[in-house]
Swiss-Prot record:
GO cellular component: cytoplasm
InterPro entries linked: aa-tRNA-synth_II/BPL/LPL, BPL_LPL_catalytic, Lipoate_protein_ligase_C, LipoylTrfase_LipoateP_Ligase
Name of the featured protein: Lipoate--protein ligase 2
Binding site for (R)-lipoate: 136
PANTHER family membership: LIPOATE-PROTEIN LIGASE, LIPOYLTRANSFERASE 1, MITOCHONDRIAL
Source organism: Staphylococcus aureus (strain Mu50 / ATCC 700699)
Enzyme Commission identifier(s): 6.3.1.20
Outcome, altering residue 135 to R: Reduces enzymatic activity
Domain BPL/LPL catalytic span(s) in chain numbering: 31-222
Length: 340
């Protein structure tokens, strides 16, 4: 099994979108006639399942405030928050594709490794999770691409659980969506379950311990590596920019949904029903007892096609004389209402 890590010119890359683009690029373009292991850890990131509605999975206000990355992966499953307190063990398996869909076999090397490190109470639970004393410490996903299994799982050493709790609590109200919602589960951490000699390890050390256990080697230096070339990295950068750092992929792929907001503003009650498709406003209707002079249909039409982001909504509404349409109301208050 080859080891590939996000190391570029001697520097460890912690950009989660780059890590994902690297895996996809290798799966599509690099064939070594052996299985490949991609372990990585990254800056705070929410990874969205391929078929999920980003808008209802995350608290966008919290994401914006704390500069947390949102990336949609190519495999299914639920939304997950990871940071430098988690190791993500991804792989390409081509030697035995019968493992596809069999999460028990897929997880076996990880379970064995964790037991060796002292976390003997880690077990597989449900279809694709690992739990420790009833708390989730890992979730897995896989897909079949190019006749190879592409999949992986996270291992929660000790992530920021406050951030995880807040970022995965959507704040939009009254949404009726056709998207698949994540199943919320209590989560735990692995650090406290490790043997005492491992409990103060860094995330880098934990990653290396898992790799050596899975590869059956004594030292990470013994691993058989494939070093990504400059040409590889250029292609990875391009893929990340075009897809995994692209708003249309990460947000615009969300299913259609509708929601309603009604709020008492300074000029009266404003009631707005919005239909969102590809995370842009497809249609909206505005009602209320506010004192405006203009035809509110002008505002409804102006909002059509606008991205559901604070920046785009502010820009679009500032093109209008909001006081003319709503009375003593600010653009900021309308945007806050739409996004609340």
């Amino acid at each position: 099994m080859y080891l590939i890590e996000p190391i570029r010119n001697g520097e460890y890359i912690t950009d989660g979108a780059i890590a994902l683009a690297m895996q996809v690029y290798v799966n599509q373009h690099i064939f070594l006639d052996e299985d490949i292991l991609f372990p990585y850890y990254c800056d705070p990131k929410v990874e969205i399942g391929r078929f999920q509605n980003t808008a209802i999975e995350v608290n966008q206000d919290y994401i914006d405030k704390h500069s947390i990355q949102v990336v949609r992966r190519d495999t299914g499953g639920g939304a997950v928050y990871v940071d430098k307190g988690a190791v993500n063990m991804c792989c390409i398996l081509e030697q035995d594709t019968s493992i596809y869909g069999d999460f028990q076999r897929f997880y076996q090397p990880a379970i064995k490794a964790l037991h060796t490190l002292g976390a003997t109470d880690v077990i597989q639970s449900g279809r694709n999770d690992l739990t420790l004393n009833g708390k989730k410490v890992s979730g897995a996903a896989m897909t079949l691409m190019n006749n190879r299994i592409y999949g992986g799982y996270s291992l929660l050493l000790d992530v920021n659980y406050e951030a995880m709790d807040k970022v995965l609590k959507p704040n939009r109200k009254k949404i009726a969506s056709k998207g698949i919602k994540s199943v919320r589960a209590r989560v735990g951490h692995l650090r406290e379950a490790l043997d005492e000699k491992y409990r103060d390890i860094t995330i880098e050390e934990f990653k290396n311990l898992m790799v050596t256990q899975i590869l059956g080697i004594d030292d990470i230096k013994e691993a058989k590596r494939y070093e990504l070339t400059d040409a590889d990295w250029e292609a990875i950068d391009e893929l990340a920019d075009k897809k995994y750092k692209n708003w249309d992929w990460n947000y615009g792929k969300s299913p259609k949904y509708e929601y309603n907001r009604s709020e008492r503003l300074s000029s009266g009650t404003v009631d707005i029903t919005i239909s969102v498709e590809q995370n842009r406003i497809a249609d909206c209707r505005i009602y209320g007892d506010f004192f405006g002079q203009g035809d509110i249909k002008d505002v409804e039409e102006a909002l059509q096609g606008t991205k559901m982001t604070r920046e785009d909504l502010m820009h679009q509404l500032k093109q209008l004389d909001i006081v003319y349409y709503f009375g003593n109301v600010t653009v900021e208050s309308l945007v806050e209402m739409i996004l609340s």
